[in-house]
Protein backbone atom coordinates (compact mmCIF):
# COMPACT_ATOMS: atom_id res chain seq x y z
CA UNK A 1 0.00 0.00 0.00
CA UNK A 2 1.30 3.51 -0.76
CA UNK A 3 2.24 5.55 2.26
CA UNK A 4 0.01 8.39 3.47
CA UNK A 5 0.65 11.45 1.36
CA UNK A 6 0.07 15.15 1.79
CA UNK A 7 -3.38 16.30 0.65
CA UNK A 8 -3.28 18.41 -2.50
CA UNK A 9 -5.84 19.85 -4.87
CA UNK A 10 -7.20 17.56 -7.56
CA UNK A 11 -5.36 16.90 -10.80
CA UNK A 12 -6.75 19.17 -13.57
CA UNK A 13 -8.57 17.36 -16.38
CA UNK A 14 -6.23 18.77 -19.02
CA UNK A 15 -3.04 17.75 -17.18
CA UNK A 16 -1.03 14.82 -18.54
CA UNK A 17 1.20 12.91 -16.12
CA UNK A 18 3.80 10.69 -17.79
CA UNK A 19 6.20 8.08 -16.42
CA UNK A 20 8.95 6.48 -18.49
CA UNK A 21 10.14 3.54 -16.38
CA UNK A 22 13.46 2.50 -17.83
CA UNK A 23 15.99 -0.12 -16.84
CA UNK A 24 18.23 2.44 -15.12
CA UNK A 25 16.07 5.51 -14.51
CA UNK A 26 12.51 6.71 -14.01
CA UNK A 27 11.60 9.90 -15.87
CA UNK A 28 8.44 11.82 -15.05
CA UNK A 29 6.74 14.70 -16.87
CA UNK A 30 3.67 16.82 -16.28
CA UNK A 31 2.29 18.82 -19.18
CA UNK A 32 -0.81 20.09 -20.91
CA UNK A 33 -1.92 20.19 -24.53
CA UNK A 34 -2.61 23.59 -26.07
CA UNK A 35 -3.93 23.14 -29.59
CA UNK A 36 -1.24 21.32 -31.55
CA UNK A 37 1.45 22.14 -28.99
CA UNK A 38 2.39 20.67 -25.62
CA UNK A 39 3.65 22.62 -22.62
CA UNK A 40 5.87 20.82 -20.10
CA UNK A 41 5.19 22.21 -16.62
CA UNK A 42 7.49 19.92 -14.60
CA UNK A 43 10.07 17.19 -15.13
CA UNK A 44 12.01 14.84 -12.84
CA UNK A 45 14.50 12.01 -13.40
CA UNK A 46 15.72 9.61 -10.69
CA UNK A 47 17.79 6.44 -10.79
CA UNK A 48 16.46 3.13 -9.50
CA UNK A 49 17.65 1.85 -6.13
CA UNK A 50 20.07 -0.80 -7.34
CA UNK A 51 19.25 -2.98 -10.35
CA UNK A 52 15.49 -3.12 -9.82
CA UNK A 53 15.00 -3.78 -13.54
CA UNK A 54 16.95 -5.92 -16.00
CA UNK A 55 16.57 -5.74 -19.79
CA UNK A 56 13.42 -3.64 -19.52
CA UNK A 57 11.66 -6.11 -17.20
CA UNK A 58 10.74 -5.26 -13.61
CA UNK A 59 12.47 -7.63 -11.17
CA UNK A 60 12.10 -5.91 -7.78
CA UNK A 61 8.60 -4.45 -7.66
CA UNK A 62 9.02 -2.76 -4.27
CA UNK A 63 12.11 -0.84 -5.42
CA UNK A 64 10.38 0.33 -8.59
CA UNK A 65 7.32 1.40 -6.55
CA UNK A 66 9.65 3.40 -4.30
CA UNK A 67 11.24 5.11 -7.29
CA UNK A 68 7.88 5.90 -8.89
CA UNK A 69 6.61 7.36 -5.61
CA UNK A 70 9.68 9.59 -5.25
CA UNK A 71 9.36 10.91 -8.81
CA UNK A 72 5.66 11.53 -8.31
CA UNK A 73 6.21 13.42 -5.05
CA UNK A 74 8.88 15.63 -6.62
CA UNK A 75 6.57 16.47 -9.51
CA UNK A 76 3.64 17.19 -7.18
CA UNK A 77 5.85 19.64 -5.28
CA UNK A 78 6.54 21.45 -8.55
CA UNK A 79 2.98 21.61 -9.91
CA UNK A 80 1.09 21.90 -6.61
CA UNK A 81 -1.61 19.31 -7.29
CA UNK A 82 -2.10 15.57 -6.93
CA UNK A 83 -0.98 13.24 -9.72
CA UNK A 84 -3.19 10.15 -9.66
CA UNK A 85 -3.60 9.33 -13.36
CA UNK A 86 -0.64 8.40 -15.50
CA UNK A 87 0.42 7.48 -19.03
CA UNK A 88 3.15 4.85 -19.35
CA UNK A 89 5.02 2.95 -22.06
CA UNK A 90 6.32 -0.59 -22.16
CA UNK A 91 9.68 -1.57 -23.61
CA UNK A 92 9.51 -4.00 -26.51
CA UNK A 93 10.80 -6.99 -24.56
CA UNK A 94 9.61 -10.25 -26.18
CA UNK A 95 7.72 -8.13 -28.68
CA UNK A 96 5.32 -9.67 -31.20
CA UNK A 97 3.70 -7.85 -34.10
CA UNK A 98 0.74 -8.71 -36.30
CA UNK A 99 -0.40 -6.97 -39.48
CA UNK A 100 -4.12 -7.18 -40.31
CA UNK A 101 -6.39 -5.66 -42.97
CA UNK A 102 -10.14 -5.18 -42.47
CA UNK A 103 -12.64 -4.12 -45.14
CA UNK A 104 -16.33 -3.24 -44.92
CA UNK A 105 -19.01 -2.59 -47.51
CA UNK A 106 -20.63 0.84 -47.24
CA UNK A 107 -24.25 1.85 -47.58
CA UNK A 108 -24.91 3.88 -50.71
CA UNK A 109 -24.54 7.57 -49.99
CA UNK A 110 -23.29 7.05 -46.43
CA UNK A 111 -20.54 9.40 -45.31
CA UNK A 112 -17.70 7.78 -43.40
CA UNK A 113 -17.38 9.18 -39.87
CA UNK A 114 -14.90 8.71 -37.04
CA UNK A 115 -17.09 6.05 -35.40
CA UNK A 116 -16.90 3.79 -38.46
CA UNK A 117 -13.14 4.29 -38.78
CA UNK A 118 -12.65 3.56 -35.09
CA UNK A 119 -14.80 0.44 -35.33
CA UNK A 120 -12.73 -0.89 -38.24
CA UNK A 121 -9.48 -0.21 -36.38
CA UNK A 122 -10.80 -2.00 -33.29
CA UNK A 123 -11.93 -4.94 -35.42
CA UNK A 124 -8.44 -5.15 -36.92
CA UNK A 125 -6.87 -5.13 -33.45
CA UNK A 126 -9.26 -7.87 -32.31
CA UNK A 127 -8.34 -9.97 -35.35
CA UNK A 128 -4.66 -9.45 -34.60
CA UNK A 129 -5.26 -10.48 -30.98
CA UNK A 130 -6.94 -13.70 -32.12
CA UNK A 131 -4.10 -14.47 -34.52
CA UNK A 132 -1.55 -14.01 -31.74
CA UNK A 133 -3.60 -16.13 -29.34
CA UNK A 134 -4.05 -18.93 -31.88
CA UNK A 135 -0.50 -18.94 -33.24
CA UNK A 136 1.50 -22.07 -32.32
CA UNK A 137 4.28 -21.14 -29.91
CA UNK A 138 6.82 -23.20 -28.05
CA UNK A 139 7.76 -22.63 -24.41
CA UNK A 140 5.33 -19.72 -24.05
CA UNK A 141 2.81 -19.42 -21.27
CA UNK A 142 0.15 -16.77 -20.73
CA UNK A 143 -1.76 -14.27 -22.78
CA UNK A 144 -0.24 -11.53 -24.91
CA UNK A 145 -1.61 -8.00 -24.52
CA UNK A 146 -1.86 -5.46 -27.33
CA UNK A 147 0.13 -2.45 -26.10
CA UNK A 148 -0.15 -0.28 -29.18
CA UNK A 149 -1.10 -0.14 -32.80
CA UNK A 150 -0.43 1.99 -35.87
CA UNK A 151 -2.51 2.41 -38.99
CA UNK A 152 -0.48 1.36 -42.02
CA UNK A 153 -3.03 2.49 -44.64
CA UNK A 154 -6.66 3.41 -45.12
CA UNK A 155 -8.46 2.19 -48.25
CA UNK A 156 -11.48 3.49 -50.19
CA UNK A 157 -12.74 1.36 -53.09
CA UNK A 158 -9.33 -0.32 -53.17
CA UNK A 159 -7.30 2.91 -53.31
CA UNK A 160 -4.89 3.99 -50.56
CA UNK A 161 -6.10 7.05 -48.61
CA UNK A 162 -4.50 9.12 -45.88
CA UNK A 163 -7.91 9.65 -44.22
CA UNK A 164 -11.40 8.22 -44.69
CA UNK A 165 -13.50 10.67 -42.69
CA UNK A 166 -15.99 12.57 -44.84
CA UNK A 167 -15.63 10.32 -47.89
CA UNK A 168 -18.28 8.16 -49.57
CA UNK A 169 -17.83 4.95 -51.53
CA UNK A 170 -18.70 1.28 -51.90
CA UNK A 171 -15.98 -0.25 -49.72
CA UNK A 172 -13.69 1.05 -46.96
CA UNK A 173 -10.75 -0.64 -45.31
CA UNK A 174 -7.93 -0.20 -42.85
CA UNK A 175 -4.63 -2.01 -42.42
CA UNK A 176 -3.19 -2.04 -38.91
CA UNK A 177 0.08 -3.22 -37.40
CA UNK A 178 -0.53 -4.18 -33.77
CA UNK A 179 2.17 -4.82 -31.18
CA UNK A 180 1.88 -7.32 -28.35
CA UNK A 181 3.80 -8.02 -25.15
CA UNK A 182 3.47 -10.93 -22.69
CA UNK A 183 1.02 -10.61 -19.84
CA UNK A 184 3.93 -10.70 -17.35
CA UNK A 185 5.52 -7.54 -18.79
CA UNK A 186 2.26 -5.58 -18.84
CA UNK A 187 0.99 -6.80 -15.47
CA UNK A 188 4.22 -5.93 -13.66
CA UNK A 189 3.87 -2.32 -14.82
CA UNK A 190 0.27 -2.21 -13.64
CA UNK A 191 1.18 -3.79 -10.31
CA UNK A 192 3.74 -1.05 -9.70
CA UNK A 193 1.20 1.66 -10.51
CA UNK A 194 -1.47 0.06 -8.33
CA UNK A 195 0.87 -0.16 -5.33
CA UNK A 196 1.90 3.46 -5.85
CA UNK A 197 -1.77 4.46 -5.86
CA UNK A 198 -1.80 5.66 -9.48
CA UNK A 199 -4.36 4.80 -12.17
CA UNK A 200 -3.05 4.01 -15.66
CA UNK A 201 -5.10 5.85 -18.30
CA UNK A 202 -2.87 5.27 -21.32
CA UNK A 203 -0.46 2.49 -22.23
CA UNK A 204 1.71 2.51 -25.34
CA UNK A 205 4.93 1.02 -26.64
CA UNK A 206 8.20 2.93 -26.27
CA UNK A 207 9.09 2.98 -29.99
CA UNK A 208 5.57 4.19 -30.85
CA UNK A 209 5.95 7.02 -28.34
CA UNK A 210 9.44 7.98 -29.52
CA UNK A 211 8.33 7.87 -33.15
CA UNK A 212 5.60 10.45 -32.54
CA UNK A 213 8.30 12.97 -31.57
CA UNK A 214 11.41 11.96 -33.50
CA UNK A 215 9.80 11.20 -36.88
CA UNK A 216 6.71 13.36 -37.48
CA UNK A 217 4.19 12.32 -40.13
CA UNK A 218 5.61 14.59 -42.82
CA UNK A 219 8.92 12.68 -42.66
CA UNK A 220 7.37 9.20 -42.84
CA UNK A 221 7.26 9.30 -46.63
CA UNK A 222 10.95 8.44 -46.36
CA UNK A 223 12.24 4.98 -45.51
CA UNK A 224 13.59 5.73 -42.03
CA UNK A 225 14.55 3.64 -39.01
CA UNK A 226 14.18 4.80 -35.42
CA UNK A 227 16.14 2.98 -32.71
CA UNK A 228 15.40 3.71 -29.05
CA UNK A 229 18.56 2.47 -27.32
CA UNK A 230 17.86 2.17 -23.63
CA UNK A 231 19.79 0.44 -20.90
CA UNK A 232 18.21 -2.99 -21.35
CA UNK A 233 16.61 -3.11 -24.81
CA UNK A 234 16.86 -1.41 -28.20
CA UNK A 235 13.41 -0.83 -29.69
CA UNK A 236 13.08 -0.35 -33.45
CA UNK A 237 10.45 1.21 -35.72
CA UNK A 238 10.56 1.53 -39.52
CA UNK A 239 8.68 4.08 -41.66
CA UNK A 240 8.05 4.09 -45.40
CA UNK A 241 5.59 5.65 -47.85
CA UNK A 242 3.97 7.77 -45.15
CA UNK A 243 3.32 5.01 -42.63
CA UNK A 244 4.93 2.71 -40.06
CA UNK A 245 5.69 -0.67 -41.62
CA UNK A 246 7.38 -2.58 -38.78
CA UNK A 247 8.35 -2.74 -35.11
CA UNK A 248 11.03 -4.90 -33.55
CA UNK A 249 13.28 -5.22 -30.51
CA UNK A 250 16.93 -6.13 -29.99
CA UNK A 251 17.61 -7.57 -26.50
CA UNK A 252 20.89 -5.65 -26.21
CA UNK A 253 21.53 -2.05 -25.22
CA UNK A 254 23.60 0.25 -23.01
CA UNK A 255 23.99 -2.14 -20.08
CA UNK A 256 26.24 -4.37 -22.19
CA UNK A 257 28.64 -1.43 -22.51
CA UNK A 258 28.45 -0.74 -18.77
CA UNK A 259 29.16 -4.37 -17.92
CA UNK A 260 32.21 -4.40 -20.22
CA UNK A 261 33.60 -1.36 -18.38
CA UNK A 262 32.91 -2.96 -14.99
CA UNK A 263 34.71 -6.19 -15.89
CA UNK A 264 37.71 -4.54 -17.51
CA UNK A 265 38.38 -1.90 -14.84
CA UNK A 266 37.22 -3.91 -11.77
CA UNK A 267 34.50 -1.53 -10.63
CA UNK A 268 30.90 -1.99 -9.50
CA UNK A 269 28.02 -1.44 -11.91
CA UNK A 270 27.18 2.09 -10.71
CA UNK A 271 30.79 3.23 -11.04
CA UNK A 272 30.96 1.72 -14.52
CA UNK A 273 27.79 3.58 -15.44
CA UNK A 274 29.36 6.85 -14.25
CA UNK A 275 32.49 6.15 -16.32
CA UNK A 276 30.31 5.57 -19.39
CA UNK A 277 28.41 8.81 -18.84
CA UNK A 278 31.59 10.83 -18.35
CA UNK A 279 32.96 9.34 -21.55
CA UNK A 280 29.78 10.34 -23.42
CA UNK A 281 30.09 13.84 -21.95
CA UNK A 282 33.48 14.23 -23.63
CA UNK A 283 35.82 14.09 -20.64
CA UNK A 284 39.41 13.33 -21.65
CA UNK A 285 40.40 11.83 -18.27
CA UNK A 286 38.23 9.82 -15.90
CA UNK A 287 38.94 9.10 -12.23
CA UNK A 288 37.44 6.29 -10.14
CA UNK A 289 38.10 3.86 -7.30
CA UNK A 290 38.18 0.15 -8.18
CA UNK A 291 37.07 -2.78 -6.01
CA UNK A 292 40.60 -3.05 -4.56
CA UNK A 293 40.28 0.55 -3.31
CA UNK A 294 42.86 1.80 -5.81
CA UNK A 295 42.52 5.37 -7.02
CA UNK A 296 42.66 5.11 -10.82
CA UNK A 297 42.90 7.75 -13.55
CA UNK A 298 42.48 6.64 -17.16
CA UNK A 299 42.29 8.37 -20.50
CA UNK A 300 39.01 8.31 -22.40
CA UNK A 301 40.76 6.56 -25.31
CA UNK A 302 41.43 3.59 -23.02
CA UNK A 303 37.71 3.30 -22.27
CA UNK A 304 36.83 3.60 -25.96
CA UNK A 305 39.24 0.76 -26.79
CA UNK A 306 37.71 -1.37 -24.04
CA UNK A 307 34.12 -0.97 -25.16
CA UNK A 308 34.74 -1.08 -28.93
CA UNK A 309 34.09 -4.85 -29.32
CA UNK A 310 30.86 -4.57 -27.32
CA UNK A 311 29.72 -1.50 -29.25
CA UNK A 312 30.46 -3.28 -32.53
CA UNK A 313 28.40 -6.29 -31.43
CA UNK A 314 25.55 -4.03 -30.31
CA UNK A 315 25.65 -2.20 -33.64
CA UNK A 316 25.68 -5.47 -35.58
CA UNK A 317 22.62 -6.80 -33.72
CA UNK A 318 20.70 -3.55 -34.26
CA UNK A 319 21.71 -3.41 -37.93
CA UNK A 320 20.56 -7.00 -38.51
CA UNK A 321 17.15 -6.27 -36.99
CA UNK A 322 16.76 -3.08 -39.04
CA UNK A 323 17.57 -4.85 -42.30
CA UNK A 324 15.27 -7.76 -41.44
CA UNK A 325 12.36 -5.40 -40.68
CA UNK A 326 13.03 -3.43 -43.86
CA UNK A 327 12.92 -6.40 -46.22
CA UNK A 328 16.69 -6.78 -46.43
CA UNK A 329 17.18 -3.21 -47.67
CA UNK A 330 19.12 -0.38 -46.04
CA UNK A 331 16.85 2.53 -45.02
CA UNK A 332 17.52 6.09 -46.17
CA UNK A 333 18.59 7.15 -42.68
CA UNK A 334 18.64 5.95 -39.07
CA UNK A 335 17.66 8.05 -36.06
CA UNK A 336 18.97 7.07 -32.62
CA UNK A 337 17.27 8.12 -29.37
CA UNK A 338 17.47 6.97 -25.75
CA UNK A 339 20.30 7.30 -23.26
CA UNK A 340 22.16 4.29 -24.66
CA UNK A 341 22.45 5.96 -28.07
CA UNK A 342 25.20 8.18 -26.65
CA UNK A 343 27.62 5.25 -26.28
CA UNK A 344 30.92 6.27 -27.85
CA UNK A 345 31.19 5.08 -31.45
CA UNK A 346 27.73 3.49 -31.65
CA UNK A 347 26.29 5.68 -34.41
CA UNK A 348 29.38 5.25 -36.60
CA UNK A 349 29.37 1.48 -36.01
CA UNK A 350 25.70 1.21 -37.02
CA UNK A 351 26.45 3.21 -40.17
CA UNK A 352 29.30 0.86 -41.03
CA UNK A 353 27.21 -2.27 -40.40
CA UNK A 354 24.29 -1.06 -42.53
CA UNK A 355 26.41 0.47 -45.30
CA UNK A 356 25.04 3.98 -44.76
CA UNK A 357 27.23 7.10 -44.85
CA UNK A 358 28.02 8.08 -41.27
CA UNK A 359 26.19 11.40 -41.62
CA UNK A 360 22.96 9.46 -42.24
CA UNK A 361 22.97 7.88 -38.77
CA UNK A 362 22.15 10.63 -36.29
CA UNK A 363 21.42 10.90 -32.58
CA UNK A 364 18.24 12.95 -32.08
CA UNK A 365 17.77 15.18 -29.04
CA UNK A 366 14.96 17.37 -27.75
CA UNK A 367 15.49 19.98 -30.47
CA UNK A 368 13.63 17.75 -32.94
CA UNK A 369 10.38 18.34 -31.01
CA UNK A 370 9.14 21.56 -32.60
CA UNK A 371 5.69 21.53 -30.99
CA UNK A 372 6.86 21.18 -27.37
CA UNK A 373 7.41 24.12 -25.03
CA UNK A 374 9.57 23.51 -21.96
CA UNK A 375 8.94 25.50 -18.78
CA UNK A 376 11.77 24.97 -16.30
CA UNK A 377 14.54 22.38 -16.32
CA UNK A 378 14.44 19.15 -18.29
CA UNK A 379 17.11 16.90 -19.83
CA UNK A 380 17.69 17.92 -23.45
CA UNK A 381 19.52 14.84 -24.73
CA UNK A 382 18.21 11.78 -26.57
CA UNK A 383 17.02 10.29 -23.27
CA UNK A 384 14.22 12.91 -23.23
CA UNK A 385 12.59 11.74 -26.47
CA UNK A 386 10.62 8.75 -25.11
CA UNK A 387 8.96 10.55 -22.14
CA UNK A 388 8.08 13.43 -24.45
CA UNK A 389 6.72 10.89 -26.90
CA UNK A 390 4.49 9.29 -24.25
CA UNK A 391 3.05 12.73 -23.51
CA UNK A 392 2.42 13.48 -27.20
CA UNK A 393 0.93 10.02 -27.78
CA UNK A 394 -1.44 10.54 -24.85
CA UNK A 395 -2.59 13.82 -26.35
CA UNK A 396 -3.16 12.18 -29.73
CA UNK A 397 -4.94 9.10 -28.42
CA UNK A 398 -6.56 9.90 -25.10
CA UNK A 399 -8.46 7.06 -23.48
CA UNK A 400 -7.95 3.90 -21.52
CA UNK A 401 -6.65 0.66 -22.96
CA UNK A 402 -8.36 -1.44 -20.29
CA UNK A 403 -11.82 -1.62 -18.81
CA UNK A 404 -12.92 -3.03 -15.47
CA UNK A 405 -15.40 -5.78 -14.63
CA UNK A 406 -16.58 -6.61 -11.11
CA UNK A 407 -16.76 -10.32 -10.25
CA UNK A 408 -18.16 -11.17 -6.78
CA UNK A 409 -17.01 -7.78 -5.53
CA UNK A 410 -13.53 -8.15 -7.04
CA UNK A 411 -12.45 -5.68 -9.75
CA UNK A 412 -10.85 -7.36 -12.77
CA UNK A 413 -8.88 -5.45 -15.41
CA UNK A 414 -9.64 -6.58 -18.99
CA UNK A 415 -7.83 -5.40 -22.10
CA UNK A 416 -10.12 -3.55 -24.49
CA UNK A 417 -8.98 -5.16 -27.74
CA UNK A 418 -9.95 -8.69 -26.79
CA UNK A 419 -13.45 -10.17 -27.30
CA UNK A 420 -13.81 -11.41 -23.76
CA UNK A 421 -16.29 -14.07 -22.69
CA UNK A 422 -17.69 -14.42 -19.18
CA UNK A 423 -15.44 -17.47 -18.74
CA UNK A 424 -12.36 -15.39 -19.67
CA UNK A 425 -13.19 -12.74 -17.07
CA UNK A 426 -13.83 -15.40 -14.42
CA UNK A 427 -10.46 -16.96 -15.21
CA UNK A 428 -8.72 -13.58 -14.79
CA UNK A 429 -10.48 -13.27 -11.43
CA UNK A 430 -9.00 -16.60 -10.37
CA UNK A 431 -12.31 -18.46 -10.66
CA UNK A 432 -12.28 -21.77 -12.50
CA UNK A 433 -15.09 -21.59 -15.10
CA UNK A 434 -15.49 -25.37 -14.90
CA UNK A 435 -17.04 -24.87 -11.48
CA UNK A 436 -20.05 -23.35 -13.25
CA UNK A 437 -20.74 -26.65 -15.02
CA UNK A 438 -23.00 -28.87 -12.96
CA UNK A 439 -21.79 -32.46 -12.68
CA UNK A 440 -24.31 -35.28 -12.63
CA UNK A 441 -24.21 -37.83 -9.85
CA UNK A 442 -22.42 -41.14 -10.34
CA UNK A 443 -24.46 -43.96 -11.86
CA UNK A 444 -25.31 -47.03 -9.77
CA UNK A 445 -24.82 -50.49 -11.27
CA UNK A 446 -26.27 -53.56 -9.50
CA UNK A 447 -27.67 -57.03 -10.08
CA UNK A 448 -31.33 -57.93 -9.51
CA UNK A 449 -32.37 -61.56 -9.83
CA UNK A 450 -29.13 -62.19 -11.68
CA UNK A 451 -29.72 -59.39 -14.17
CA UNK A 452 -27.42 -56.37 -14.43
CA UNK A 453 -29.25 -53.09 -13.83
CA UNK A 454 -27.97 -49.47 -14.01
CA UNK A 455 -29.55 -46.39 -12.49
CA UNK A 456 -28.31 -43.05 -13.92
CA UNK A 457 -26.96 -40.42 -11.57
CA UNK A 458 -29.09 -37.46 -10.61
CA UNK A 459 -29.00 -34.17 -12.50
CA UNK A 460 -26.39 -31.82 -11.13
CA UNK A 461 -27.44 -28.75 -9.17
CA UNK A 462 -25.57 -25.42 -9.01
Range-by-range predicted roles:
Residues 114, 118, 351-385:
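Conserved phosphate-binding/catalytic loops in two-lobed NTP-binding clefts
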Residues 55, 259-262, 370-374:
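Short, charged, surface-exposed secondary-structure boundary motifs
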Residues 31, 89-91, 206, 229, ...:
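Generic beta-strand/beta-sheet core signal
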Residues 382-398:
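Short, structured interface segments
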Residues 215-280:
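Acidic, glycine-rich loop-and-beta core segments that form the ion-binding/anion-interacting portion
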Residues 311-319:
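A general structural motif
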Residues 1-25, 29-224, 243-245, 269, ...:
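Nucleotide/phosphate-binding catalytic cleft detector across ATP-hydrolyzing
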Residues 201-206, 250-251, 380-382:
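Active-site nucleophile and cofactor-binding loops and adjacent substrate-binding regions
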